[in-house]
Amino acid sequence: PVNEAGVERLFRALVGRGCPADCPNTCDSSNECSPNFPG
């Protein structure tokens, strides 16, 4: 099973910088809001 909290924390650490204001911690590598994470 996936540890969602751990995955989200890693995701934020990797791509959480330079994201749009409406989803500053949940964007993908293109700085778009990621549909796979709550934002």
Curated annotation (Swiss-Prot):
Keywords tagged on the record: Amidation, Disulfide bond, Neurotoxin, Secreted, Toxin
CC terms in the record's Gene Ontology section: extracellular region
Compartments, as annotated in UniProt: Secreted
Chain positions listed as propeptide in the UniProt record: 1-16
Entry comment describing in which tissues the protein is expressed: Expressed by the venom duct.
Chain positions found as Proline amide: 38
A GO molecular function held by the record: toxin activity
Post-translational modifications: Contains 2 disulfide bonds.
Coiled coil: none
Entry comment, domain topic: The cysteine framework is XIV (C-C-C-C).
Annotated protein name in UniProt: Conotoxin Cl14.5
Organism of origin: Californiconus californicus (California cone)
